[in-house]
């Protein structure tokens, strides 16, 4: 049985065809680590985990990379555009790095408690700003944005 996934670009379900035979690269956005998550925040990780497990059962080797937003998350539907970590830092008296480190541990503990398999590798947004800008440029160039 083939795997069919919804393609948000074409707005259709399409047969999954990996770029490399039996290998899948999966990049997902991780949490913004400034506060405790609620179950709605964790739902995407459950969905990605189910997809990873299906791919593995189908014989694919999955390399899953997840970013952790440890700075620069500026907007949501219900705020004034202030960086979430700067705001949490001001309110707690701790620096942004301490807050991020604490909530990364909370997030990883939540994954474990929910039996969600961890990504192959985590990386912090602050460690790869130049690379992310280039990645977005390539996606835009290819018409995905």
Predicted features, each with a name:
Residues 1-145:
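NTP-dependent nucleotidyl-transfer catalytic core
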